[in-house]
Regions:
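Double-stranded RNA-binding/processing signature
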Residues: 1-172
Length: 172
């Protein structure tokens, strides 16, 4: 069991891990009283989902990747591009750790697979900004990094994140 998996297994004991693995659709279901997947989770309001943690985690992932590739004297922009994409987070990381089995979400409204679909390119070669149904999975992965940071912020959070992200770079 690697470091990220250890944190995933703390879902029942760590509030921030539980929050990281709670999509907004689960919060909506719980508020309406029909969440059957995780009855014990009680959200006070719609902010109690993984959105805020995801923003924090996304920033930490980018910071770490920039630092890592800078120290290796590699092209930061090119090297980090792959590892910070939603496609990598969904198709590689989430799939490897089977995140969907741990994530609280409304499976009637969201896909229950890891088949990330690229949105395509515009005529000028830029990525289209259309909605991707699998984004919520990447959000959960980013939120987990945010939660891990918060759990370790008074200790050596950088070391914990470093171990996890280095492990991610070896997953195919």
């Amino acid at each position: 069991m690697d470091k990220f998996e250890e944190y995933l297994n703390k879902k029942e004991n760590e509030y921030n891990i539980k929050l990281a693995l709670t999509d907004t659709t689960a919060v909506t279901l719980k508020k309406s009283g029909i969440n059957k997947k995780n009855k014990e989770f009680e959200a006070v309001n719609s902010q109690e989902s993984n959105k805020q943690l995801s923003t924090l985690g996304d920033s930490i992932i980018k910071f770490y990747l920039c630092s890592y590739f800078y120290e290796k004297k590699e092209n930061i922009s090119e090297k980090k591009k792959y590892y910070e994409t939603d496609e990598f987070l969904v198709s590689v990381i989430a799939k490897h750790y089977n995140i969907l089995d741990k994530l609280d979400y409304d499976s009637t409204k969201k896909p229950n697979d890891y088949n990330y679909i690229k949105c395509g390119k515009t005529s000028t070669g830029k990525n289209k900004k259309s909605h991707n149904d699998h984004k919520f999975i990447a959000t959960a992965v980013e939120a987990m990094i945010g939660a891990i940071y918060l759990i370790n912020k008074d200790d050596d959070w950088y070391k914990e994140i470093s171990i996890i992200l280095k492990e991610w770079m070896t997953i195919k």
